[in-house]
Amino acid sequence: IEDLIADESVVITISHAGYIKRTSLSEYKTQNRGGVGQKSAGTRDQDFLEHLFVATNHQYLMYFTQKGKCYWMRVYEIPEGTKTSKGRAIQNLINIESDDKVKAFICTQDLKDQDYINSHYVIMATKQGQVKKTPLEQYSRPRQNGINAITIKEDDELIEAKLTTGNSQVLLAVKSGKLVRFEEEKTRPMGRTASGVRGITLADEKDEVIGMVSIDKNDVTES
């Protein structure tokens, strides 16, 4: 079926409530700087857009859940919609447990490309401050029911996952207002069943990690 689908560029939008769709990039006309913009998605009451990717139909979208599972979908399998449509609920597209929730998304190139999967990693962070780096190669064989991406300890959950080249700086931010920055290369690669290592020490029981970003070191300029 892949050979019958044009590998065109598309815009993937995902709402806070978990509605997803893809729309041809050609539907979005170029505007001058300072333009009013174009509507990219319709949303239900009290919902809003949270994620946006530009990809091609033959790429993969990886879903990571709060319980630490990973699911895959070819981009062309994402329901197609117009700029104003609301999309489909992710829960109806993948075999996710009813008490689990997708927390992070990664868009990747061809998972059959050995050079690509051997030169990239997935780095994850949990609410309680654990971080883990795993070679992308360990996620290169999609399964319909998903796989375990990280072992989540009791009272913890996955909050973010990022694709890296192994040459990034990682920043973790916590609710108490603190932030830690470290070199990705100092985090050794681990298997999918590992629970990771301590990335940041929380201030108290009420503190938690609220976000993680990764920046390629080639894009960092020190002042």
Question: What name fits each language-model region?
Answer:
Residues 1-223:
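Short, structured "edge-of-domain" segments at secondary-structure transitions
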